[in-house]
């Protein structure tokens, strides 16, 4: 989550490429998650989209969200699907109006952000000042002590590098991957109960039709499992 143009989609591209998730056809492509024609034309993310990457023994689910204020509802909709957020902040600009909006929404759900100070390679970058500004923002939003003790990763998504110290960067994004594994709690799910999944996003594939995307809160998914789809009015249909 972040203000528009602070580098979310570029970061996701970088994580996908460095994790080896992409096939050879997609390697080196830009704005991989922005498949919508309007998004590619305007160069911004409009719809929130999810993907998963493998890193070592872990599967990390990632949702790329819009930063433009006009599409803030997309951010709210998908926060129910995640256990933490990467809050990207530009190393020159610091927190911006939409940074405050998305952070407040994350706090409202009790999430503890990992702060990613992005674009540390920009001329005029002032990462230490940005960290202080983020702390002040969190404090003004009523963050808990745990949320105020936020982990920080410095990065340049365009160069594909990250580090815990902006003066001693690694040559890849491993410090960010490691921070995600270290800081983000595993999902709390009752695996033995009956299946329950809240659909937060819809996709479409010409082969399988409509795809419901959401978070499993109970049980397990298995092929050919009969399910009941319940709408917001309480109506039910079997599928």
Predicted regions and their residues:
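P-loop NTPase switch module centered on the Walker A-proximal segment
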Residues: 1-89, 93-95, 102-103, 129, ...
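Ordered, soluble secondary-structure elements with a strong preference for glycine-centered loop motifs
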Residues: 6, 72, 123-128, 163-171
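Hydrophobic regular secondary-structure detector
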Residues: 9-10, 114, 132-133, 171, ...
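A short, flexible beta-alpha/helix-coil linker loop
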Residues: 68-69, 120, 158-161
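Conserved C-terminal guanine-recognition region of P-loop GTPase G domains, centered on the G4
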Residues: 79, 85-147
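Conserved catalytic-core segments of large NTP-driven translation/proteostasis enzymes
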Residues: 138-239
């Amino acid at each position: 989550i972040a203000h528009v143009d602070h580098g979310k989609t570029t970061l996701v591209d970088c994580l996908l490429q460095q994790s080896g998730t992409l096939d050879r056809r997609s390697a080196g492509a830009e704005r991989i998650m922005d498949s919508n024609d309007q998004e590619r034309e305007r160069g911004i993310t409009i719809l929130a989209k999810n993907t998963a990457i493998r890193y070592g023994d872990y599967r990390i689910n990632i949702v790329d969200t819009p930063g433009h204020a006009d599409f803030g509802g997309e951010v709210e909709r998908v926060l129910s699907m995640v256990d933490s957020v990467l809050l990207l902040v530009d190393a020159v600009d610091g927190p911006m109006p939409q940074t405050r909006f998305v952070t407040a929404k994350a706090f409202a759900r009790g999430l503890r952000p990992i702060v990613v100070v992005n674009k540390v390679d920009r001329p005029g970058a002032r990462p230490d000042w940005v960290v202080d500004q983020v702390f002040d923002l969190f404090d003004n939003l009523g963050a808990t002590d745990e949320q105020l003790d936020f982990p920080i990763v410095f990065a340049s998504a365009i160069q594909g590098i990250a580090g815990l110290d902006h003066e001693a960067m690694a040559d890849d994004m491993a410090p960010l991957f490691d921070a995600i594994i270290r800081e983000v709690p595993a999902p709390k799910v009752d695996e033995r109960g009956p299946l329950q999944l809240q659909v937060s996003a819809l996709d479409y594939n010409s082969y399988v039709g409509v795809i419901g995307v959401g978070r499993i809160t109970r049980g397990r998914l298995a092929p050919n499992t009969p399910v009941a789809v319940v709408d917001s009015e309480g109506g039910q249909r079997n599928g």
